[in-house]
């Protein structure tokens, strides 16, 4: 490396010049290239969730990437071989829509954005190994996404079927259930989602439902919140499947329940509107009514239909079933809250013991039969509403008087012996729908042949490359359906004319395995090497937003398990530790009556804010940074003004990483002042060690010991904080040690000062790499600070020769005094009696006895 940029006499740190210089030096020296000659025990894979290349970083990005970078730098100094890569989640609708709007191609738009964002990332001083870079929209990446699809297809884990799907009318594409929010709107466009029946490709994630659920308990270093969200989404239910005969028919209806103890209270059945039996059972007189009902409910999303607050709609099918437990006839209804894809598409109506069923029964005047009562004697107040708790069986034939929990087992045994019930485990989890009717995605490598059916594109013929010269409109069918010369091809099996699949894959398919490709991104023969995956995976620390708890994180877990089943890898889980960082928030100015946002510049009086249009009161609150809310802060502006190290320090110090961070300009200024203070302290201390006249100044051994004590406390505290991801308290400790050392440096020996400032610069370097590098060279070192070892904690240095001796009179603390640890019991007694506190409270009395607790207290009993 070249020499420092600074003059030893400089009293002010100029971040812009220094940071640009060292970023260039690090790149020229390839400082952060990963050592590939490693063993598993000595590796640390630090990974941030890779970004969509929008063209500009936001503060949420900064927080994510800085957290990961601090860990990467720290682990390198701890002697581990660190992999810290970066890439681009670059397929998807935003690029396609941006290309349409700007009349360019998605690839051109994406390449430009990637170039801009790489520059922005480098300005943050991130220790990224750019030789590991991956871009999901490049052929050398999506070739292997297609290869993985082929492996899944070979193993019966990918299939096509006709399905009613969530259709985004704005983006003109299909959405997975996970991509529809609680209001039935698209997660990306915000459009009201519609229902549509199409041939779609699915991945068989349900084959791994039990493993995905069971293995959550092994993810001890994941946030509980994320594990609970995944557990609820997988939705394992242990219960029974009950078979109901249909009156005057050979047909039967099966329904799943977790409450077989309520079977005697089933007073009706409810079918999903697309249940296959409906069209066989419906009277011709009711077909028009049925069609009207179906059209109404098809406008609802699954989440809306399951909502507890929405009134449930239904219609009587005109046919009855038989309750097998008591042989009573019960009506069969169609209900908009029953979803065919969940369970069997039929549910038991038990209004006495289920809130949703109770609401439905009240709406349509259906019978309500209580079969469980509270275990509280004769109190019948429970009859006024649904009773959903445990209790005692009633109206249940031979099971009356039994506790409901015990009755579950007995009724299931009875039903099994009578052939109308059997044990059953179900999951809410549905297979992953990956078909997308858009251009900018990974083509599905399937060829449709009239003779051979669906045929995989041979692995040797991959990738199926997206056509470049294509007109994008954003409307109607997939743009690929217009490229007949691309669609028309030959069947790989029989050689006859055939057509390519025109759907592309969900972008989450590309982002569910990228962490594997980082290991060998230049490998042209395989997507990854199993032996290398064994060395680096699972990722030791993954950092990203909580919004990916279900989509990306669940899909990545599934694909990892699927690839293991296909024999491609050995690991079961992709990420050992997960940190979900909080949002970065800033002040917003909003009219609560109109929900209109205003910029700070539009508010004339911040102390008494008013809507500039209506004069109404403005609400000032912290919200997630957003352009639409006028509260975004451009990282580039902050770096230009204060430097990257200040931005890094602020983002780390302001809040614990898992908590939301409230942006405050004054706090940024505070970090900038600390950077300047750190600079001056190290420079001035270094000057002291080179001051010849200092040899005449009397040094104090106690000050040397104090300096070493302070720096070793800092080593221990900061090491512990980094191990526990508590970056804010680590930086607080940095500030504390600088303040403490500043008071005593003039009385310390040169040897101690040189040792202390070297350690200080080292423990600063993960947080503020630029100033640390500059200071390291300024104090006379040649090799980069980022190639140094993390300082070892010296426990002996923090042990002091003195301690605070507490003086008690009759068991009550009355004072204290510093005492030597080497004093005998008699010396401590003598010292305690002569203190001002003892003299005052003894008031001339002689002690009856004196109790000494070594290195702690003396209790004088009078």
UniProtKB/Swiss-Prot annotation:
Gene, per the UniProt record: leuS
Superkingdom of the organism of origin: Bacteria
GO biological process, alphabetically ordered: leucyl-tRNA aminoacylation
The reaction(s) this protein catalyses: tRNA(Leu) + L-leucine + ATP = L-leucyl-tRNA(Leu) + AMP + diphosphate
Name of the featured protein: Leucine--tRNA ligase
Enzyme Commission numbers on file: 6.1.1.4
GO cellular component: cytosol
Residue numbers covered by motif 'HIGH' region: 51-61
Chain residues that bind ATP: 627
Positions of short motif 'KMSKS' region: 624-628
Subcellular localization: Cytoplasm
Major subcellular site: cytoplasm
Enzyme class of the recorded protein, top EC level: ligase
GO molecular function: aminoacyl-tRNA deacylase activity; ATP binding; leucine-tRNA ligase activity
Keyword annotations of the record: Aminoacyl-tRNA synthetase, ATP-binding, Cytoplasm, Ligase, Nucleotide-binding, Protein biosynthesis
């Amino acid at each position: 490396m070249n020499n420092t940029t600074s003059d030893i006499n400089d009293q002010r740190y100029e971040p812009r010049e220094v940071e640009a210089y060292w970023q260039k030096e690090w790149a020229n020296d390839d400082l952060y290239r990963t050592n590939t000659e490693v063993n598993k025990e000595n590796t640390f894979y630090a990974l941030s969730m890779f970004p969509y290349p929008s063209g500009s970083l936001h503060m949420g990005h900064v927080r994510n990437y800085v957290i990961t970078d601090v860990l990467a730098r720290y682990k390198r100094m701890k002697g581990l071989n660190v992999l810290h890569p970066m890439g681009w989640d670059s397929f998807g609708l935003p690029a396609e829509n941006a290309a349409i709007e700007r009349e360019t191609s998605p690839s051109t738009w994406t390449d430009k954005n990637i170039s801009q964002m790489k520059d922005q990332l480098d300005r943050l001083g991130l220790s990224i190994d750019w030789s590991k870079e991956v871009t999901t929209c490049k052929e050398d990446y999506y070739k292997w996404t297609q290869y993985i699809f082929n492996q899944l297809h070979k193993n019966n884990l990918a299939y096509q079927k006709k399905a009613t799907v969530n259709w985004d009318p704005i983006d003109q594409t299909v959405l997975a259930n996970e991509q529809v929010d609680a209001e039935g709107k698209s997660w990306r466009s915000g459009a009201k989602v519609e229902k549509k029946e199409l041939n779609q490709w699915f991945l068989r994630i349900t084959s791994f439902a039990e493993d995905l659920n069971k293995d959550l308990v092994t993810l001890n270093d994941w946030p509980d919140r994320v594990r609970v969200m995944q557990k609820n989404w997988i939705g394992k239910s242990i219960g029974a499947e009950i078979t109901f005969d249909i009156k005057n028919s050979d047909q039967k209806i099966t329904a799943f329940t977790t409450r077989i103890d309520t079977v005697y209270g089933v007073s009706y059945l409810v079918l999903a509107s697309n249940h296959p039996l409906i069209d066989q059972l419906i009277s011709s007189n009711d077909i028009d009514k049925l069609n009207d009902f179906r059209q109404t409910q098809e406008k609802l999303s699954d989440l809306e239909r399951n909502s507890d607050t929405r009134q449930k709609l239904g219609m009587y099918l005109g046919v009855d079933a038989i309750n097998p437990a008591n042989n009573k006839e019960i009506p069969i209804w169609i209900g908009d809250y029953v979803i065919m894809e969940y369970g069997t598409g039929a549910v038991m109506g038990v209004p006495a013991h289920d809130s949703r069923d109770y609401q439905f029964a009240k709406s349509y005047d259906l019978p309500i039969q209580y079969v469980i009562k509270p275990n509280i004697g004769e109190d019948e107040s429970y009859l006024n509403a649904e009773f959903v708790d445990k209790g005692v069986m009633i109206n249940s034939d031979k099971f009356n008087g039994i506790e409901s929990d015990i009755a579950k087992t007995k009724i299931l045994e009875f039903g099994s012996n009578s052939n109308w019930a059997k044990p059953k485990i179900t999951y809410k989890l549905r297979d992953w729908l990956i078909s997308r009717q858009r251009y900018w995605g990974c083509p599905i490598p399937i060829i449709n042949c009239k003779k051979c059916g669906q045929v995989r594109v041979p692995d040797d013929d991959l990738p199926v490359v997206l056509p470049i010269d294509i007109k994008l409109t954003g409307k109607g069918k997939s743009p690929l359906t217009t490229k007949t010369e691309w669609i028309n091809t030959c069947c790989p099996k029989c050689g006859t004319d055939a057509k390519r699949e025109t759907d592309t894959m969900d972008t989450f398919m590309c982002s569910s395995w990228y962490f594997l490709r980082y290991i060998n991104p230049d490998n042209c023969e395989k997507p990854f090497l199993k032996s290398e995956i064994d060395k680096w995976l699972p990722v030791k620390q993954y950092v990203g937003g909580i919004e990916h708890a279900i989509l990306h994180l669940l899909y990545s877990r599934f694909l990892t398990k699927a690839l293991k089943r296909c024999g491609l890898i050995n690991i079961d889980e992709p990420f050992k530790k997960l940190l979900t960082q909080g949002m970065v928030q800033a002040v917003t100015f909003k009219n609560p009556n109109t929900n209109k946002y205003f910029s700070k510049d539009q508010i004339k009086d911040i102390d008494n804010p008013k809507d500039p249009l209506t004069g109404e009161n403005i609400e000032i609150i912290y919200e997630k940074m957003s352009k639409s809310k006028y509260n975004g802060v451009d990282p580039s502006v902050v770096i230009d003004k204060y430097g990257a190290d200040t931005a890094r320090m602020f983002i780390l110090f302001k809040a614990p990483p898992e908590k939301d961070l409230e942006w405050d300009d004054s706090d940024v200024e505070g970090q900038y002042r600390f950077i300047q203070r750190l600079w001056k302290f190290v420079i001035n201390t270094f000057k002291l060690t080179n001051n010849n006249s200092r040899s005449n100044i009397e040094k104090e051994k106690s000050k040397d010991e104090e300096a070493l004590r302070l720096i070793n406390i800092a080593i221990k505290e900061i090491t512990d904080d980094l191990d526990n991801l508590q970056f804010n308290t680590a930086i607080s400790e940095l500030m504390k040690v600088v303040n403490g050392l500043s008071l005593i440096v003039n009385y310390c020996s040169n040897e101690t000062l040189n040792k202390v400032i070297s350690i200080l610069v080292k423990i600063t370097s993960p947080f503020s790499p630029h100033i640390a590098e500059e200071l390291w060279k300024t104090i006379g070192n040649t090799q980069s600070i980022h190639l140094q070892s993390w300082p070892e904690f010296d426990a002996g240095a923090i042990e002091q020769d003195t301690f605070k001796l507490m003086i008690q009179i009759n068991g009550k603390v009355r004072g204290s005094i510093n005492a030597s640890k080497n004093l005998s019991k008699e010396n401590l007694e003598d010292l305690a009696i002569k203190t001002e506190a003892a003299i005052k409270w003894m008031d001339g009395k002689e002690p009856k006895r004196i109790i000494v607790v070594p290195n702690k207290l003396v209790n004088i009993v009078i």
